[in-house]
Amino acid sequence: MTKIIGLTGGIGSGKSSIAQHIESLGVPVYITDIEAKKILEIDAVIAKVVALFGEDILDKEKIDKKKIAALVFQDPEKLRKYNNIIHPKVFLHFQNWVKQYENLPLVVKEAAILFESGSYKDCDKIILVTAPKETRIKRVMKRDGVSREAVEQRMAHQWDDEKKKALSDFVIENIDLVKAKESAENIISVLRNQ
């Protein structure tokens, strides 16, 4: 039976870099953020999101993800309602995706909010990617071109690393990407041999 390995970490921790590296090792990786963005292009989903937030969130009949982020990260109730539209669809898509890899020993599900969404319960093992808070803030400001305040707002909606560590099987500290990738290789080797 294929093991589902959860890969998570706070915004700016470098989990996407680690996910790419794991994929280069021949392990299929499901990136929940990418699939969630695809789901946001489905007409029925667009209609539900517009019903929730109004037509101001549209840009040429597509959902403006920056406008959504600005709304949901300021209001926990809006975030909860938004997630209730998106998460069940991502969950179903993942269930179908993983079926094509039933002959493999493991697959990885990369999700920023693996714990917060409760989907960690569906994973056999969990890898947490961490980095110092200040490093994470600087990475996201540079990557997304957003203010420090915007990054801190997003962080406020994620569990802190200590809480995540308590539920994780492996922790990769991503201060030095080369060392973090080596840690990922070692963890994948262990998981393949379990």
What label would you give each PLM region?
Residues P88-L92, V107-A112, E152-H157:
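Short gly/ser/thr-rich secondary-structure transition/capping motifs
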Residues I4, A19, T32, I42, ...:
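A general structural signal for well-ordered alpha-helical segments in protein cores
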Residues H93-Y101, L106-R143:
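ATP-dependent NMP and nucleoside kinases share a basic, alpha-helical "lid"
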Residues I34, K38-P105:
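ATP-dependent small-molecule kinase phosphotransfer cores
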Residues P28, I34, K125, D169-F170:
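Well-ordered beta-strand positions
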Residues I4, V29, P105-L106, K165, ...:
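Hydrophobic "anchor" residues on beta-strands that sit immediately upstream
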